[in-house]
Amino acid sequence: GAAPGTSLRGVVAKVSAQVYGSPAAALATFGVTGTNGKTTTTFLLSYVLELLGRRPGLVGTVELRVGGQAQASAMTTPESPDLQAIVATMVERGDTDLVMEVSSHAIELHRADALSFNVAAFTHLSSDHLDFHGDLESYFAAKAKLFTPQRAAHAVICVDDVWGQRLARECELPVTTVATHISTDVEADWRVRDIVGTASGSDFTLSGRDGELRTSIALPGEFNVSNAALALVSLLASGVSLGELERVLSASGGLATAVPGRMEVVSQSPRCVVDFAHNADALELALAALRSTTTGRLHVVFGATGERDTTKRAEMGRIAVLGADEVIITDDDPHDEDPAVIRAGVASGARAAQATDAGRGTVVQEIAPRAAAIAAAVAKAGPHDTILIAGRGHETIQEVAGVNLELDDREEVRVALAAREGSL
């Protein structure tokens, strides 16, 4: 049996690595953790690795990419035997790198124990998954476990928030820090400067000891500039030179890639954007990003997930009312909880915000099911309006009381737009 104090899952991870011959040793490995931004950062990392002529395998929330073939993903980080088999297949099929999202659940449940990353990157931390970890301190401790000598050779840490700053201080690894908010008054090896918002994204400068790089990202929002900077600094930390990055990025026109369900622009008039934002922090950032480039009204369609951290429901309602002109509260994935109860939790925060000066002008409606809410928003929007459909992103299955229904927000937007064209 396992010795006391060792975890069976940890043992399984190590045995899996031995069975498959520690396949990750043949690859350059990048692990990305943090509350929001993991998926986008890993997609951007993979994109630039491809520009550099490498062949990255990808393990994450949206897809699994092995040997250049992508398939839909079931969970952020697979269980260790599956993971080792996936990595072994990558090596066999000629992949040169492994880029992986590492969730705090995966760290706590020892799924990635047998992998050691060349570079472990940290986006930021905010209250999410507290149903699993209990409080922010234990959530931080779970994330921090990735940044130990057994798990990684080098840390790249975004120091925009206090958690990143603390991780950089406490971490036992060689650390490269990056500050991406202009307002962050903290020492960092690399910083982002001169962000200019464009219709489709942002231009920005990454500047550090070794020089600077002016480039662009084709995803809206300053938080995506943060993700881009983290991806680029992770590559620099892995040994890619600034000159090489400059060469491939100027040839490609910057980080010119879309990420499924991450600030994904489905149409332009009205502009419909589908995003995975499913906590207050991400919702606030997404709304702020779209507000700055919307000449008409800003609409948001969203709900909260059932059987998850219930404290964030009212807060999401409040953020929506303060950030948008038109709010439609609908269903997300209710799971086995009564959808009306979840909507009421969100609505309570929305109504409270409407009672304040800042939220007084916002229109709030409750419309279910979700497809009807999306249709209502699209029918109502003017040509210069923006509609953010938040919470589900790339997901194509909605779980209601144990039944999986097909539902793709992007598809519902297209259907609603076609109906709108027909009635104009």
What residues fall within each predicted segment?
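N-terminal leader/targeting and accessory segments in enzymes
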Residues: 1-14, 18, 162, 220, ...
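Phosphate-binding loop of NTP-binding sites
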Residues: 4, 9-159, 163-171
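ATP-dependent carboxylate-amine ligase
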Residues: 10, 28, 43, 50, ...
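Cofactor-binding loop segments of dinucleotide-utilizing enzymes, especially the Rossmann-like FAD-
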Residues: 35, 61, 158-159, 180, ...
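Short acidic, glycine/proline-rich loop/turn micro-motifs
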Residues: 68-72, 217, 399-402
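Generic detector of well-ordered alpha-helical packing
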Residues: 80, 102, 125, 132, ...
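Acidic, Mg2+-coordinating active-site environments of NTP-dependent enzymes
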Residues: 93, 99-100, 108, 117-271, ...
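Short acidic loop-to-helix transition motifs that present clustered carboxylates
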Residues: 104-107, 185, 369-373
